[in-house]
Amino acid sequence: MSIARRTTLSKFLIEQQRETNNLPADLRLLIEVVARACKAISYNVSKGALGDALGTAGSENVQGEVQKKLDILSNEILLDANEWGGNLAAMASEEMETFFPIPANYPRGEYLLVFDPLDGSSNIDVNVSIGTIFSVLRCPHGKQATEESFLQPGTEQVAAGYAVYGPQSVFVLTTGNGVNCFTLDREVGSWVLTQSNMQIPADTREYAINASNARHWYEPVQRYVSELNAGKEGPRGDNFNMRWIASMVADVHRILNRGGIFMYPADKRTPDRPGKLRLMYEANPMSFIVEQAGGAATTGTQRIMEVQPTGLHQRVPVFLGSKNEVERVTAYHNEGK
C-alpha cells in the first residue's frame, strides 16, 4: 500500500462524516483525541524496562487490584488528553472510584467517555499483548454530568473501541456502522486503515476461558465446556481448541479476526458478585464491537447491551463472539432457570 493511497483514521472519520451524515464533528474529534492518547500509551508500553514503567505502583485501584505503574500512567494520559478539548462533560475510568468531571476552566461538551486505560495489565512485565478499551455515551443532562449520567445501557453507546499494544499496535473502532481496524504506522505516526467491515464467523472451533477455574463454574458452563473438550467423539462431533491469553483485548481481537467464543463466567466462589469483568469499561464496549461485527454478547441469560447499569463499577458475566456458540451457551443457562 503506497503512502499516498493510505487511509488514515482522520481521513476515514471525515469521509464517514460526509457519507453517512451521522457522525457529529464533536464525536469525530473526540475519537481522534482518544486515538492520539492510545498512540502515546503504545509508545510508553513499547519502552518496557527502558522507560522505568514496569512493576507495581504500590497502590490499589477501586477494584482492590494492585496497580501497575503503566496502569496509572495510561490513566493519566487519557485524562490529560481529553479534559481540555471541549468534547466531554465527564470521564469515568476503571482505575478511579468516582467519575471525573471536566474542570470548570475548560469548555464542556455533550459526551461521556468511559475507559479501561490498560486492560490485561497483569501481562505487562512478561511482554504479552495488552490494550485500552473505551466507550462513548451522550450526556443525558447536557453538559452537567452526575454519576447517574453514566448509568445507561450499552445500547446507548455512540462509539466504542479498543487498542491492542502487541507486535503491532492496532486501533479497532465502531460508531454503529460496522467495525474497522487501523494499524499504527510508527514511521509517520498515523493510524492507517488496514481492515474494513470486520466480520466474526458465526461458527467456530476455538474457545477462550480460564480453565483453571473449572471446578468453580456453574453447571451450564461446565456442560458447555465439557462438550467442547469431548471432541469429535462427543455430542458436538467436532474437535475444539482452547486459547487463553488472560488479556481481554488480545482474546477478543483474535476472535474478531478468525472467530471464537470468549467466556468469563460468574462462579461459585463469589455468588454475591456476578462475574469479574466490568460492565461499563469492558463488557459494553466489547459487546458493541462484537455485535457490529456480526457476533453476539450475553451474560448467559441476557444481552449484555440491554443490562441496566446500577453502578460505575458493576460486574457481569461475559460470553461473546461467534453467534452460534454464544447462543448455545446462553440456551444452556436459560434451560436451568
Curated annotation (Swiss-Prot):
Binding site for Mg(2+) 1: E94, D116, L118
The organism's place on the tree of life at top rank: Bacteria
A molecular function GO annotation: magnesium ion binding
Catalytic activity line of the entry: beta-D-fructose 1,6-bisphosphate + H2O = beta-D-fructose 6-phosphate + phosphate
InterPro entries reported in the protein's UniProt record: FBPase_C_dom, FBPase_class-1, FBPase_N, FBPtase
GO CC list: cytosol
Family matches, as Gene3D superfamilies: 3.40.190.80, Fructose-1,6-Bisphosphatase, subunit A, domain 1
Compartments in which it is found: Cytoplasm
Pfam families: FBPase (PF00316), FBPase_C (PF18913)
Pathway(s) served: Carbohydrate biosynthesis; gluconeogenesis
Binding sites annotated in the UniProt record for substrate: D119, G120, S121, S122, N210, K276
Keywords (A to Z) from UniProt: Carbohydrate metabolism, Cytoplasm, Hydrolase, Magnesium, Metal-binding
Main EC class the enzyme belongs to: hydrolase
NCBIfam families given in the database record: PRK09293.1-1, PRK09293.1-3, PRK09293.1-4
UniProt similarity note: Belongs to the FBPase class 1 family.
Protein name in UniProt: Fructose-1,6-bisphosphatase class 1
Species in which this protein is naturally found: Burkholderia vietnamiensis (strain G4 / LMG 22486) (Burkholderia cepacia (strain R1808))
Gene field: fbp
